[in-house]
């Protein structure tokens, strides 16, 4: 399994007062940015159906999200983020099992692995940082991203990054606490931008993922 940080996240539907609530909680606005994300998969959706998500972000490079911790229920996800191109390529060859792997960057192996663009869209993001009161100074802050995609969809995400599986429950507890402070209903589940994009523009692919998820074959919705 590829190594990387474990991302623990929960998506929610932001309201008109979300930024005001963040300010009241003492969150600080880190930056506002605009970027393009492009996602790749095979025509059979081999990656997404196995809960792997390959993305190229403009200005940031490649990332492969792989399934993380299992067995923790609720409206949240845990993924291992792999950003080293060598590690991504190794994982892609392991997943897709196509021929002999040679040293190369991700872009160079797209063709041989039959990976093609399945989605591309622009996001405007405001990124906030928040440390819960009483937290130790060395504890990582939570990140709250508020995204607006160019196809008319907005979604928020509360995120924590941890190094070990043992840290996931504590991170999840913080995420649930902050979500509650922001007025997010306990069981609210907001879909990722990619899933909404596929639903609108590639409905057949979206339906395949939906059917696989309902049958327990996949656990989609990681794409941020």
Curated annotation (Swiss-Prot):
Coiled-coil intervals: none
Cofactor binding: number and manner: Binds 1 Mg(2+) ion per subunit.
Gene Ontology biological process terms from the UniProt entry: thiamine diphosphate biosynthetic process; thiamine diphosphate metabolic process; thiamine metabolic process
Domain CYTH, chain residue ranges per copy: 5-201
Entry-linked CDD domains: ThTPase
EC number: 3.6.1.28
InterPro entries (alphabetical): CYTH-like_dom_sf (IPR033469), CYTH_domain (IPR023577), THTPA (IPR039582), ThTPase_euk (IPR012177)
Residues reported in the UniProt entry to bind Mg(2+): 7, 9, 145, 157, 159
Compartment(s) where it occurs, according to its Swiss-Prot or TrEMBL record: Cytoplasm
List of residues that carry N-acetylalanine: 2
The family this protein is said to belong to: Belongs to the ThTPase family.
Function statement: Hydrolase highly specific for thiamine triphosphate (ThTP).
Record's protein name: Thiamine-triphosphatase
Source species of the chain: Mus musculus
Name of the coding gene: Thtpa
